[in-house]
Amino acid sequence: MIIVTGGAGFIGSNIVQGLNDRGITDILVVDDLRDGRKCLNLADADIRDYMDMDDFLARIQTGEDLGRVEAVFHEGACSSTTEWDGRFVMRVNYEYTKALLAWCTQRKIPLIYASSASVYGMGPTFREAREFEQPLNMYAYSKFLFDCHLRAQQGIESQVVGLRYFNVYGPREQHKGSMASVAYHFNNQLNESGRVRLFEGSDGYGPGEQRRDFIHVDDVVAVNLWLFDNPQVSGIYNLGTGRAQSFNDVARAAIKWFRAQGEDGGRERGGIDYIPFPDHLKGRYQSFTEADMGALRAAGYDRPFMDVETGVPAYLSWLASQDKR
């Protein structure tokens, strides 16, 4: 059996699909389905069982044996960067992951967990070392502190990998609302008004020229499954493309896709409106991120990553296919 926590969420449900593509269906999904819309992410997936997050945590804290477990993909977390209830965030992100680490290492079960590029704060260096880490919100701090906890462990004999996700976009993120990717929001904006809204310049960048390392979720899944295939690899690794691209690049890729749809597609769609940069984000907004991918490449992962010119059209085509169902 393989356990996927957060398995009804964005990245978790895509990992489930990736496992299904390999013919693997002996999967236990762990999640919090108070937002029942997330079940739609699993409607076309095959799994063996579901367990509520709180029930799962209680069982691993008491050391319950859940049978033969091949690996745990831990994607479950409070991922909102605007959540300031520190007790809640630390319980869900930090204490939960600590308990899962102890449970897995005691049983020598491989654990591949989601960290975050947010641990680097404003950057400008995005490399897996303490000197470059300066979290700016509770979410980032909870991820950072667990990475520190892992670094302090001695004598772990099984695989443990933390993946610092950069800006992930792609299918099955619609439940995330305001926390969904800009590609998702641009799709909605172009459908509604034919225009994309971007922030004006900030931190020395021109309008829409703030740059992020945007990575398609299919590439994220590919790395997770490669790690599953290579249990000798452990450590904390960045997971982006290694190339920063601007929000304008994402907008242009979306506009180009809409314009290519023909008569009912994007003839009238394609404007970009630049809106004032919000005061509440000043000093808290990453205007530039770019993963240093040296560590993961050195570990042996050599596949190419999609750029936004490839990944965004693929994603918008998927969204359009969902609208027609």
From Swiss-Prot:
It holds the Pfam family Epimerase. It catalyses: ADP-D-glycero-beta-D-manno-heptose = ADP-L-glycero-beta-D-manno-heptose. Pathway: Nucleotide-sugar biosynthesis; ADP-L-glycero-beta-D-manno-heptose biosynthesis; ADP-L-glycero-beta-D-manno-heptose from D-glycero-beta-D-manno-heptose 7-phosphate: step 4/4. Its EC number is 5.1.3.20. It comes from the Bacteria. Gene3D superfamilies: NAD(P)-binding Rossmann-like Domain, UDP-galactose 4-epimerase, domain 1. Keywords: Carbohydrate metabolism, Isomerase, NADP. GO terms for molecular function: ADP-glyceromanno-heptose 6-epimerase activity; NADP binding. Substrate binds at N167, S178, H185, F199, E200, G201, S202, R212, Y285. NADP(+) binds at F10, I11, D31, D32, K38, E75, G76, A77, C78, S79, K143, V168, K176. Transmembrane segments: none annotated. The active site is at Y139, K176. Binds 1 NADP(+) per subunit. Homopentamer. Contains a large N-terminal NADP-binding domain, and a smaller C-terminal substrate-binding domain. Catalyzes the interconversion between ADP-D-glycero-beta-D-manno-heptose and ADP-L-glycero-beta-D-manno-heptose via an epimerization at carbon 6 of the heptose. HAMAP family: Heptose_epimerase (MF_01601). Belongs to the NAD(P)-dependent epimerase/dehydratase family. HldD subfamily. This is ADP-L-glycero-D-manno-heptose-6-epimerase.
